[in-house]
Amino acid sequence: MTDEPSRKRRLLLRSGKSPFDTGSLEDALHRDVFATNTGNLIFSDAAHKILTTPRTDVFSNGIRAVPSEAERINEEYDVFVVPLANAFRPTFERPLARMTQLIRQLRIPVVVLGVGAQAPLAYDAKRLKPMEQTVRQFVAAVLDRSASIGVRGEFTARYLADMGFRDVEVIGCPSMFLNGATFTLTKRQGPLTDGSRIAVNGSHSAVRAHGLDAIIRRAHGRYPHLRFIGQNLLEAELLHWRETPHPDGAQTSMPTHPSHPMYREDKVRLYIDPVTWIGELRDFDFSFGSRIHGNIAALLAGVPSTVLCSDSRTLELCRYFEIPHRRISEVPDTVDPAELYEAADFGGLVNGHEERFLRFIGFLERNGLENTFTHGDGGAAFDARLAGLALPPAVRPWIGNDPEALSARFGWLRSRMEELAAHNAQLRGRLAGRTSPVGVRIQIGQGTGTLPTVYRRARRVVGRPVRKLLRPEE
């Protein structure tokens, strides 16, 4: 774009959705607005707030990189900002390569915030060797368009340094700077008691392979107000629809599974919007578990938290921010949350926050980016706008046959059926003028010469939750 002194800068942000997007829970889950993990929205919303200034407007680009969109981005935006988490991992290699294809076609600056490499706790990068060329190409493309690249912590910095990259800065994660230079956190009570409100979080692998299931089970037996906070799309589907096509959904040790006692007792939640997530955690006394952004959400709510680290991605971030943490492999499955709470020291986190914040905004300035705390209102207008929105509530277990809950779900199903019917009508209209059976088959797809019915498509979208609820004996 041409640079005019009086024109506001247009910043394109890689994020699943804008913080100001509202809609139904069903639509959010169907579109997967948080890219399989709601923790992604914690840091993308923080980046959106931090980078919004009187001279900069921020726009969400979605998660998927589309190289064919490069020319439009060049014409419409002034800078592309890419907040990332553990992007240097084998399962993310293909999306990373697509992102590189897009970036190589951009003529505007590209700034990466907080990218991380994922490896075992011992910081052994051997498992990343097969994707080294993909990482090299990505980092080189970014550094051709920025002064430096921001990484999560020490391990990722060393990983890139070993490849020969020098313009690498450790900045942590933007989520920790949501509220600027100050970070207030104190233990609001003495030792935890049976009446304490405790939040717990954990991935499927931590629950299945690292003993977190036993820790949760014991905590559930002792603390009546324990609540599990889920983060994955499959967990949201299990909570809202009672089923998911993902194979991990069959793991009954997860509190998000319908057979789990915490599910049946309505002691599980998942949040689409970080502002709702953080807001509901404010009344809790402690948070713990293996999810780094699940615990960061609690810290931002002023709730003492301890992270149970299972790999380098969480460990390096905890070390950088001095977040209380334990290696999950060294935590006995008999540990009581009260022990973690008592041992947690937040002095380093609180006292070192301003220095880390200044380092972060220094990185932004070196890359030509303003921030709301130095150049704006500290996010006041952003927060006020969020406060005025009617955001969807937490996703919670679907138990019972509450008419309101049924109405919302059936209403969404009906709208989806109408959309699919309209889409089918369009396809049939396009096919009506065709006389060649071969042409019809090509248009429809491989292996079949008939259009999928609305009913079949709807079933693929929602599965069988309604029938299972109405006929539980099946």
Predicted feature locations:
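Active-site anion-handling motifs in enzyme catalytic cores
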Residues: 1-470
